[in-house]
């Protein structure tokens, strides 16, 4: 029996009372709705609480005794989860507020840059307008002054009428008579003087010349550059996931984000050189790379003997049959290659090896220890474990490989590393070893960060298509030689470290070299066919040796080449030298055989040493 005064509402249906125990569900209490059609306990065996047996209620209580500690544990766990959730959310909220502050601060910087640029342009417009205003004021004042001087001597009668009357009166006198000068004559004499003064001054000529000094300018904006800037603004930020458990997802998301940005801004990605199969006069198949023939090997077909370059592809058969070829120096393993690569299969003596998307797993010893130059081409889809690349390799090229590198993947022997078009694997600190001396970077998709490039690197080249912002610290202070080709993101102050001694802006470089971009550590500067004009102070005073060559065609107006230059080398330049292009007291000028201009216009000091040499 149930006491009437006790509330017995169902937890699922609060307007109904608990009346039954479900015999099929561990004696869980139920109401009439629980057992009705659509209820969770419909057609289950039930026992009424009004007539429940002692054994059933005892069984339920014992079951509850077992369940209750789990409920307590569940509540405690939920409370801990709630606490953790609150802490995480509070941290997220705090970070959200910080992010908003950072966002506002960074965009304020951008707004300030744009405001300064706008003020500078407005200042130029104002200066030009003030000059035009001065010209207008000068002309107006001069002409009005002449008109005022002329008008103040006029009376109500016209000058012509007065002159006619005076001449008629004078003609009545004999030539020898004395003429009595009246007031009209005095007026005419004064007016005559004023007229002669007006005609004899040079104001008219000066004013005509001043008309030519007017400068009516129209401001124009380069929409292509504006669109590039708009697109590149998407590269100035990224989102980092701060959850410790999601680091891998974070890396993947960041890489995908960077890849998308790169794809959006580079629709003309350069691909690895396409390899087409050709047939020579002896009916031997070959492919050509960098104008060199690699004959395609197959054990079932005739093959030229003693070839220095061989390519092995899908279905080529065992490589053991080529071990006799002592001339073999260059090998390609093409897409689909699936033959054994156990140690010793590739013969010693190979010095250059290129590996594409092969199906055979590389093992330690697969690559001979004679290989000094190694390339992993687009599509290579294996993990490069420690020891796969032998310690004989000095030159390593990495294209669009599909597995991330590990610390130790690149051996300490590698001194020259090329990251080629499409390379997209993370470059966490330590991936590139501290033995690398020369690093060449093409149009890669992975984002460089501070620490990606070790301090051991002394020579760096950024090739066409590189499209990342080189913020301060990306290029480490150990680099002393730096080359730029047609990179896509403008350099900023700090992009070039103070350690750079030798700097080259090579063919196609299309960024503005504003003052401060080139650091004061640079002593040797080479300018080739760059696409943007230089400014005064673009070249810092630290530069003592300047080489201008290879079709350079930007104006060399006075002041562009600073007086600090001691030695100037001139090659095949397209721009015309003018007086002041070269500092008059420069110490030495070296002229290449392709230089075809006279230096007379530069009016150089007699002390300047001029000699002819071949530029390198």
UniProtKB/Swiss-Prot annotation:
<feature type="repeat" description="FNIP 2">
    <location>
        <begin position="380"/>
        <end position="421"/>
    </location>
</feature>
<feature type="region of interest" description="Disordered">
    <location>
        <begin position="241"/>
        <end position="270"/>
    </location>
</feature>
<feature type="repeat" description="FNIP 4">
    <location>
        <begin position="466"/>
        <end position="508"/>
    </location>
</feature>
<keyword id="KW-0175">Coiled coil</keyword>
<feature type="repeat" description="FNIP 3">
    <location>
        <begin position="423"/>
        <end position="464"/>
    </location>
</feature>
<dbReference type="Pfam" id="PF05725">
    <property type="entry name" value="FNIP"/>
</dbReference>
<feature type="repeat" description="FNIP 5">
    <location>
        <begin position="509"/>
        <end position="550"/>
    </location>
</feature>
<feature type="compositionally biased region" description="Low complexity">
    <location>
        <begin position="241"/>
        <end position="269"/>
    </location>
</feature>
<protein>
    <recommendedName>
        <fullName>FNIP repeat-containing protein DDB_G0290639</fullName>
    </recommendedName>
</protein>
<feature type="repeat" description="FNIP 1">
    <location>
        <begin position="337"/>
        <end position="379"/>
    </location>
</feature>
<dbReference type="InterPro" id="IPR008615">
    <property type="entry name" value="FNIP"/>
</dbReference>
<keyword id="KW-0677">Repeat</keyword>
<dbReference type="InterPro" id="IPR052697">
    <property type="entry name" value="FNIP_repeat"/>
</dbReference>
<feature type="coiled-coil region">
    <location>
        <begin position="239"/>
        <end position="274"/>
    </location>
</feature>
<feature type="repeat" description="FNIP 6">
    <location>
        <begin position="552"/>
        <end position="593"/>
    </location>
</feature>
């Amino acid at each position: 029996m149930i006491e009437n005064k006790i509330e017995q509402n169902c937890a699922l249906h609060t307007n109904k009372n608990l009346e039954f125990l479900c015999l099929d569900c561990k004696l869980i209490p139920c109401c009439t709705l629980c057992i009705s059609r659509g209820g969770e306990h419909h057609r289950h065996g039930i026992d009424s609480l009004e007539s429940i047996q002692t054994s059933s209620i005892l069984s339920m209580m014992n079951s509850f005794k077992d369940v209750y500690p789990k409920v307590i544990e569940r509540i405690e766990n939920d409370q801990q989860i709630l606490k953790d959730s609150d802490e995480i959310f509070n941290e997220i909220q705090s970070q959200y507020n910080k992010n908003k502050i950072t966002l506002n601060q960074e965009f304020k910087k951008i707004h300030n840059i744009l405001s300064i640029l706008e003020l500078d342009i407005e200042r130029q417009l104002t200066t030009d307008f003030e000059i035009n205003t001065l010209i207008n004021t000068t002309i107006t004042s001069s002409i009005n002054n002449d008109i005022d001087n002329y008008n103040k001597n006029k009376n109500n009668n016209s000058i012509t009428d007065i002159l006619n009357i005076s001449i008629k009166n004078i003609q009545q006198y004999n030539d020898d008579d004395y003429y009595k000068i009246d007031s009209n004559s005095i007026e005419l004499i004064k007016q005559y003087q004023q007229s002669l003064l007006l005609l004899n001054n040079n104001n008219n000529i000066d004013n005509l010349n001043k008309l030519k000094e007017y400068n009516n300018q129209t401001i124009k904006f380069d929409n292509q550059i504006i669109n590039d800037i708009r697109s590149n603004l998407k590269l100035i930020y990224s989102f980092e996931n701060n959850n410790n458990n999601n680091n891998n997802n974070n890396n993947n998301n960041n890489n995908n984000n960077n890849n998308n940005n790169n794809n959006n801004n580079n629709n003309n990605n350069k691909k690895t050189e396409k390899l087409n199969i050709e047939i020579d006069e002896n009916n031997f198949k070959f492919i050509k790379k960098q104008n060199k023939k690699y004959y395609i090997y197959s054990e079932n077909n005739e093959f030229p003997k003693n070839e220095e370059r061989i390519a092995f592809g899908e279905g080529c058969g065992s490589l053991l049959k080529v071990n006799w070829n002592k001339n073999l120096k260059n090998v390609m393993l093409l897409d689909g290659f699936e033959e054994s690569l156990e140690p010793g299969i590739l013969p010693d003596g190979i010095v250059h090896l290129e590996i594409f998307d092969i199906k055979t797993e590389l093992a330690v010893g697969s690559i001979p220890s004679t290989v000094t130059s190694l390339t992993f081409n687009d599509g290579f889809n294996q993990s490069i474990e420690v020891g796969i690349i032998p310690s004989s390799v000095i030159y390593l090229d990495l294209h669009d490989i599909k597995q991330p590198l590990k610390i130790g993947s690149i051996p300490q022997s590698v001194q020259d590393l090329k990251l080629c078009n499409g390379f997209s694997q993370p470059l966490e600190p330590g991936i590139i070893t501290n033995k690398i001396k020369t690093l060449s970077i093409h149009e890669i998709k992975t984002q460089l960060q501070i620490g990606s490039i070790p301090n051991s690197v002394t020579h760096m080249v950024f090739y066409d298509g590189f499209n990342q912002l080189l913020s301060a610290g990306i290029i480490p202070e150990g680099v002393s030689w730096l080359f730029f080709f047609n990179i896509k993101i403008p350099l900023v102050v700090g992009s070039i470290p103070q350690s750079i001694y030798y700097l080259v802006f090579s063919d196609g470089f299309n960024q503005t070299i504003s003052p401060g971009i080139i650091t004061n550590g640079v002593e040797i500067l080479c300018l080739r066919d760059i696409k943007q004009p230089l400014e005064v102070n673009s070249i810092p005073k630290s530069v003592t040796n300047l080489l201008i060559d290879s079709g350079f065609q930007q104006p060399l107006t006075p002041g562009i080449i600073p007086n600090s230059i001691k030695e100037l080398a001139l090659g095949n330049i397209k721009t015309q030298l003018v007086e002041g292009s070269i500092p008059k007291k420069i110490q030495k000028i070296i002229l290449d055989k392709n230089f075809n201009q006279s230096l007379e216009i530069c009016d150089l000091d007699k002390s300047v040493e001029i000699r002819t040499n071949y530029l390198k």
